[in-house]
């Protein structure tokens, strides 16, 4: 596991604007801040009677979800519709991929429908990067989660949640707790927090759920929950990803909750104004107590609201970056012909 797994040139156009959104690795602090600022401006749209702006009118956004996720798919659909885009959601279970069609063939057929942007979720790490390398240069690709690798929009909505509740990342202590090994959210959060200047990033997990080389992310590692939670400002809980586990990693869910579950008593070890986050879906009584998930320090539902704004920001910025690159390429061709 290394924190250097994305090719920056593929994600950005020649002017340094967002073109694809595949990973937070390699993206500069200024760009992450621009995404947060843009999302902040879109939060107001959600409070309007008519929740629409015309930024993507005439554009088609295609959600290609090879992995189920009600929350991510729905918020991407809402984000695109609030930007006035036409939205197609591919039901992969009934698509030609289940009949043996390759991923590239599926995307070529979608391109023939004149889609301008793909939002891709896939069980294989690197799938979004592969797609971005093989689609038409006019199409933007957004990673909605790929294997264990990355979930960049979740990472950014978590950063927006933290910034709106804590003001900035300076002097913050943030703890990420649970199944770090299988979590693409953990990877994206660690990269984002480091880039945005968070000075104290902690990961708390049993040794069997910690990936090798995690120290390269500039984090402090704790296997004792009580020690790791002491005086933190933010607690990000992660679910146990049983579907990605092979036997022997955990004795039982009950044992995990006993050692790493976030209870009211454990939360008291954090700062009194600490916030509690979770990317969902929540496993109550496994990684978090209901009293904490529904309590006054929980901002879990805020994360869902902020997720729409972040995805609006990413969709609009990537489309703008693609348009700018087409203009750059067109001008280059004109100069060569003169």
Curated annotation (Swiss-Prot):
Q: Which Gene3D superfamilies match?
A: Aspartate/ornithine carbamoyltransferase (3.40.50.1370)
* Residue sites binding L-aspartate per the record: 99, 184, 239
User: Which pathway does this polypeptide act in?
Assistant: Pyrimidine metabolism; UMP biosynthesis via de novo pathway; (S)-dihydroorotate from bicarbonate: step 2/3
Q: Please list the GO terms describing molecular function.
A: amino acid binding; aspartate carbamoyltransferase activity
Q: What is its EC number?
A: 2.1.3.2
| Cellular component GO terms, alphabetical | cytosol
Sorted alphabetically, which keywords does the UniProt record give?
Pyrimidine biosynthesis, Transferase
Give a short account of what the protein does.
Answer: Catalyzes the condensation of carbamoyl phosphate and aspartate to form carbamoyl aspartate and inorganic phosphate, the committed step in the de novo pyrimidine nucleotide biosynthesis pathway.
Subunit comment:
Heterododecamer (2C3:3R2) of six catalytic PyrB chains organized as two trimers (C3), and six regulatory PyrI chains organized as three dimers (R2).
Q: Hey, which family's this protein in?
A: Belongs to the aspartate/ornithine carbamoyltransferase superfamily. ATCase family.
Name the record gives this protein: Aspartate carbamoyltransferase catalytic subunit
Species, as recorded: Stutzerimonas stutzeri (strain A1501) (Pseudomonas stutzeri)
The gene from which this protein is expressed is: pyrB
């Amino acid at each position: 596991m290394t924190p250097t797994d994305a090719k920056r040139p593929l994600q950005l156009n020649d002017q340094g604007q967002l073109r694809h959104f595949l990973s937070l690795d390699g993206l500069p602090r200024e760009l992450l801040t621009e995404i947060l600022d843009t999302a902040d401006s879109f939060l107001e749209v959600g409070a309007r009677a008519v929740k629409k702006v015309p930024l993507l009118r005439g554009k088609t956004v295609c959600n290609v979800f090879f992995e189920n996720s009600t929350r991510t798919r729905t918020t991407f659909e809402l984000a695109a519709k609030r930007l006035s885009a036409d939205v197609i959601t591919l039901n992969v279970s009934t698509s030609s991929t289940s009949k043996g069609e390759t991923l590239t063939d599926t995307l070529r057929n979608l391109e023939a429908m004149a889609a301008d942007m793909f939002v891709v979720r896939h069980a294989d790490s690197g799938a979004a990067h592969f797609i971005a390398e093989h689609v038409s240069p006019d199409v933007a690709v957004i990673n909605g989660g790929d294997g264990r690798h990355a979930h960049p929009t979740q990472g950014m909505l978590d950063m927006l949640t933290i910034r709106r509740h804590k003001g900035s990342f300076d002097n913050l202590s943030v703890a990420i707790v649970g199944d770090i090994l299988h979590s693409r959210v953990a990877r994206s959060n660690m990269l984002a927090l480091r880039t945005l200047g968070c000075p104290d990033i902690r990961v708390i997990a049993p040794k069997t759920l910690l990936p090798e080389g995690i120290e390269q992310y500039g984090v402090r590692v704790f296997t004792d929950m009580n020690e790791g939670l002491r005086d933190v400002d933010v607690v990000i809980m992660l679910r146990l990803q049983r579907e990605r586990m092979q036997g022997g990693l955990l004795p039982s869910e009950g044992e995990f909750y006993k050692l790493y579950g976030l209870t009211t008593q454990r939360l008291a070890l954090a700062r009194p104004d600490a916030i509690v986050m979770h990317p969902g879906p929540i496993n109550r009584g496994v990684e978090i107590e209901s009293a904490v998930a529904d309590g006054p320090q929980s901002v879990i539902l805020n994360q869902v609201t902020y997720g729409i704004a972040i995805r609006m920001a990413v969709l609009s910025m990537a489309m703008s970056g693609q348009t700018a690159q087409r203009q750059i390429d067109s001008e280059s061709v004109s100069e060569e012909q003169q």
